[in-house]
């Protein structure tokens, strides 16, 4: 599956940077912010972090997000895109090979409706924990 089949380049272009996360060789999560660009054929190219431990071929997550603070308090214009996949070296960049995407944009789905939609999943999760709490 290509990046264009999973990731809408128009929506991705609304973000200025990504946060690249992977599990390092010692088993700990490692995250670093990085710039990115979209190639003419829709590939997601991440700028290599200056100190980038080996992550080639490993599962990675890249979080692209945006939030605007309101001077009087609170936030607006919230959105994110989380892309799971793998990276490979490509002409001085890290090419992201997307495998799964989740995203949210409050202009499409307001925050209160997002929370309401998550209630069944949260309830199922809490019910699965109940036996261990009762023990």
Spans of features found by a protein language model:
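Binding-site signature for planar aromatic cofactors or substrates
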Residues: 1-135
């Amino acid at each position: 599956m290509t990046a264009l089949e999973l990731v809408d380049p128009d929506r991705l272009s609304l973000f200025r940077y990504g946060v690249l996360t992977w599990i390092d060789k010692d088993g700990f999560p490692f995250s670093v912010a990085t710039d990115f660009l979209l190639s003419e054929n829709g590939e997601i190219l991440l700028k290599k972090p200056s100190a980038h431990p080996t992550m080639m071929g490993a599962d990675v997550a890249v979080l692209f997000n945006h939030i605007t603070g309101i001077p009087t308090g609170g936030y607006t214009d919230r959105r994110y895109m989380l892309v799971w996949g793998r990276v490979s070296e490509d002409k001085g960049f890290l090419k992201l090979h997307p495998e799964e995407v989740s995203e949210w944009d409050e202009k499409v789905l307001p925050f209160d409706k997002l929370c309401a939609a998550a209630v069944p999943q949260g309830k199922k999760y809490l019910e699965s924990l109940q036996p261990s709490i009762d023990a």
